[in-house]
Amino acid sequence: MVKQSPEKLVKELETYENTPEFFYSIRSLDQQPGLHALTDIQRAARIIYLNRTCFNGLYRVNSQGYFNTPFGQYKHPVIANKPVIMAVSEYLNTANVKIVCGDYSIVLKQLPSDAFVYLDPPSHHGNFIVHLLYP
């Protein structure tokens, strides 16, 4: 939605509140059947909002796949960062960018030899996924 409808996305984000009550109502949507009824704009805004207002911007889900990072308690988070959203939209619309979600072993075989690739696999440590693992 950043690429196709940045203005609509910003407008949606501007309605979002920085309160624990609003945060937890948005966070809990993935536990309700209504999540699938949201528009693409609303789903994109939800992810951006949660990232900007949750603790340390940490995207984390529990074993059931539900987002479970707590409210970040920031005094003035920038939820609807219009200049950044517009700049990213312009870049995505003018550059040859392809964002892919898939098995890395398959995706890598489909790329040209001069492609820039970023892979972000989880690091497993016992029964817990470690977000940063240093040697």
Task: Write out the residue ranges for each language-model feature.
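Glycine-rich S-adenosyl-L-methionine
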Residues: L132-P135
